[in-house]
Amino acid sequence: MTNITNIGFFCQGIRVVKITDWLNWATFMETTTDQWAVVLPMIQRGSVWKPHQVIDLWDTILRGMPFGGLMASHIPAVSTLEFFHPLKRTLVNLPANGGLSLIDGQQRTLAMLIAWPAVDQQMQRRIWVDFGEDDNYDHLLRLHFTTESSPMGYQRGGPSGQAIGRLSLAERRLANATYADRMAAIRAAEPANSVKLRYLHDDEITPWHSTLALDLRLLIERHQEGAQALRTYVENQAQDAKVKLDARITLIKAKHVPFDAYDDALLEAIISHLRKRITTIEKCMGSSERATRIHVLEQGLERMTRQHFPVIEVPEHLMHAEEKDEKKDPPLAVLFKRIGTGGTDLKTSDYVFSVLKHLNPKCHSLVETQLKSTQISAIYTPTDLVMSAVRLVAAQIEPEKDQPKLDKAQFTRLLRDEKKFQRKTPKSPASLLNSTNKLGSMAHL
C-alpha cells in the first residue's frame, strides 16, 4: 500500500478529503497527524461570492450533495514561494508537511469558513439559520446572510440561483435607527478600523427580515458538543431573543439617547416591527415546527461530518513557471482565467495586483499599510489602490500618455520595460510605495 505522506499530499493526481479536515487545515488547526495548511497563492480574484451563492452552497452541504472538486498544488515547506492565510491578509510560513495552494475553490472554501467554529469572529460575513419560519422555495431551512456592508442582512431569499436583493433604503434607515445606540456604543469602545466588524458580530443584532435567526457558526459549535447541547442552545436563544426585543421596545419608549431625537412616526414604525417579531417568536415557541427545524439541522450537520470531496492536483511546476513569450501570460494566470470561465473571472485589476505580488511580495504589505487608514480604505479597495498607483508610475515613465483604463496588454508592455517600470516597482518597491503614499495624502484632503 502506498504511503501518501512519503510522496506528498496527492496520489495519482488526486486526493479525497473530508470537509471538516479541509476547514481545519484552512484555519491551521492541527486535529490529525496528517496536518496540512490550506493557503492562497499570490494570484487571486478580488471579488467575493454573492449572498445567494453562499446560501446555496450551505444548503448543498446540509443536504449531503456533492459540490464539485477543488484544485490545489502541494507546496513543500522549503519552497521559496510566498502565500496568504485564507482568513487574514498576512503572509504565512508553511508547516512541516507543506501547504496546499488553493487554485480553484477559494470562494467555496471561504464560504464554508464563514460558519466554522475555529474561525470565531474573524470573518466579515455571517450566515444564519431561522428557526422561526420555513423556506418557501427549495432550501432545507430558511437561511440569512449578513456582511460588514449589510449588517442588517438582505431581502428574503428566493429559489436556488436567484440573486437576493439588498434591503430597501427605507428598510435600511429603519433598521439602523432601531440599533443606533449599539453603533454609538461600539464606536466609543472600539478602534475605528474594527467598528464595522464588531457591529456585524454584535449580540443584539440579527437579520432585519428574520424571525428567530441564530448564527450557524455557533450552532455548529453546539452540535460538536452533542445533540442535546444544540437543542438546549436553540431553546435558550428563543427565550433570550424575546427578552431582548421586549427590552429594546422599553428602551425606545423611554426615549433615551439617541431615540429621544426620533419623531413619533419613526418610533411607531420601529416598535411595530419589533412587536411583530415577538409575536412570531411566541407562536414558534408554542408549536412543534421549531423542533422539526432543529432536527433537520442536526441531520444536515451529521451529513457534513461524513462528507468528502476531491482535490485535484495542479502540478507544482506551474506555480514557478514563467511564460517565455513576453506577450503571453504565465501558465498559472492562464489556468486561473480558464477555470474562471464557469465562475468568477480574473479581472484586470486582480491580475495586475497578483503579478506585482508574485514579482515582489512586499507590494502586498505596502498596500495593506495604506489601507489601515480608514480615510483611505473608505475610498480605495486594495485593487483600486494598486491600479491607481500603477497609473501614477506609468505616468512618470511616459508623462505624455495617460491610461485611464489600463488593460493587461498595456500592463504587460510596462513590465517588459525593465529599465523603467520593473526598476521602479518589482525590484525596488519604493516608487509604488511613493505612489500609494501620494494617493493616501489625497484621501486625507
Annotate each language-model stretch with its function.
Residues 2-3:
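Positively charged N-terminal leader segments that act as targeting/secretion signals
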Residues 10-47, 58-395:
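Basic- and aromatic-enriched surface patches that contact anionic nucleotides/nucleic acids
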